[in-house]
C-alpha cells in the first residue's frame, strides 16, 4: 500500500482545478484544499500501520492487497470489508463519505460480476478487470461523476437545444471515444487520482451517445474541475473550525472539453 507522501505527490500532476476564476497549481499547497488532502494522506499512513485491518491476501494471486479491493466470496470476506470501511470512516469521524474505499467498492463489484460488461462484447469485461487490477495494485484513489447538471430533466439528454450539456460521446476514433459535456457533484475528485464517469439518472431510448461508463485520470487533457467554495476558505482557523476546515470533500463540477478516452478505459 502506498503511503501519505506518495499520495500527495500523485496530486501534483498538472490537474486543471479552477477556484474563483484562477487555476490552482497545487491542491496539496493551496489553503482551500491542503488540509483535506493532508487528512487523506494521514489515513494512508495509518492504513500502512494497521495492515492487519486494512490489507488481506488476494485469493487469486496470493499477494497482499488493500482489503477495500477484496472481492467478497464469504461472510468472512464481508467482515474484512466492513472493517476497512470502518477504518476509513473513523479517520474523518464519519464526515467524509467519499474516501478511497468508496469507489474502490464500485470497481470491486464490477470485477466480481464482469460478465455483466461482457454483454456489450468481451472487450468491456476485460477492460473492467484490467483497470480493477491496476487500481488495486497501485492503491489508487478513484472518485466518480454520475450526476448531470441541474437542467430541465423532463427533456431527454439528446433533445436539449445544446446537445452536450450532459456528458456524451462526440465521436469515436481508432484511439477511443471523445467526451464533451459536464457532470455535477463529483465529490472528492480534486483529491483523487482517477475519475469514473457514468449516469445515475435514467436515459431515454434515443440517448445512446450518453450511455457512458468509463475512467479517466484526473489530469486528463481537456478535463476541468470547478469546485464549489471549500469550507476551508471560510474558516478563520483550524482551531475554531476543526471539522469543516479539515474534512471537506468539495463537490465539484467536472467539464469534459473533448476529452479522449482510450478504448481500454471504456466499460
How would you name each of these model-derived features?
Residues 1-59:
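Acidic/polar, glycine-rich intrinsically disordered N-terminal extensions of enzymes
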Residues 45-142:
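Internal helix-loop-helix
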Residues 139-152:
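A short, Trp-centered hydrophobic/proline-enriched beta-strand micro-motif
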Residues 34, 38, 133-136, 178:
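Generic structural signal for well-ordered, non-transmembrane alpha-helical segments
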Amino acid at each position: 500500500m502506498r503511503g501519505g507522501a506518495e499520495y500527495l505527490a500523485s496530486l501534483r500532476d498538472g490537474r486543471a482545478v479552477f477556484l474563483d476564476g484562477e487555476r490552482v497549481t497545487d491542491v496539496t499547497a493551496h489553503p482551500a484544499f491542503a488540509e483535506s488532502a493532508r487528512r487523506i494522506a494521514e489515513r494512508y499512513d495509518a492504513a500502512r500501520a494497521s495492515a492487519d485491518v486494512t490489507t488481506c491476501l488476494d485469493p487469486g494471486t496470493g499477494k497482499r492487497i488493500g482489503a477495500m479491493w477484496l472481492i467478497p466470496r464469504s461472510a468472512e470476506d464481508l467482515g474484512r470489508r466492513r472493517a476497512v470501511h470502518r477504518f476509513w470512516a473513523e479517520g474523518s469521524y464519519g464526515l467524509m463519505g467519499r474516501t478511497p474505499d468508496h469507489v474502490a467498492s464500485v470497481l470491486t463489484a464490477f470485477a466480481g460480476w464482469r460478465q455483466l460488461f461482457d454483454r456489450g462484447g468481451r472487450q468491456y469485461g476485460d477492460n473492467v478487470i484490467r483497470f480493477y487490477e491496476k487500481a488495486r495494485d497501485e492503491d489508487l484513489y478513484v472518485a466518480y461523476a454520475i450526476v448531470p447538471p441541474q437542467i430541465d430533466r423532463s427533456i431527454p439528454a439528446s433533445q436539449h437545444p445544446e446537445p452536450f450539456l450532459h456528458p456524451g460521446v462526440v465521436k469515436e476514433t481508432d484511439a477511443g471515444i471523445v467526451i464533451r459535456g459536464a457532470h455535477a457533484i463529483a465529490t472528492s475528485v480534486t483529491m483523487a487520482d482517477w475519475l469514473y464517469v457514468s449516469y445515475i439518472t435514467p436515459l431515454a431510448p434515443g440517448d445512446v451517445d450518453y450511455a457512458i461508463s468509463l475512467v479517466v485520470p484526473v489530469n486528463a487533457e481537456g478535463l476541468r474541475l470547478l469546485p464549489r467554495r471549500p469550507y476551508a476558505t471560510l474558516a478563520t482557523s483550524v482551531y475554531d473550525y476543526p471539522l469543516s476546515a479539515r474534512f471537506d470533500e468539495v463537490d465539484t463540477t467536472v467539464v469534459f472539453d473533448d476529452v479522449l478516452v482510450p478504448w481500454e478505459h471504456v466499460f
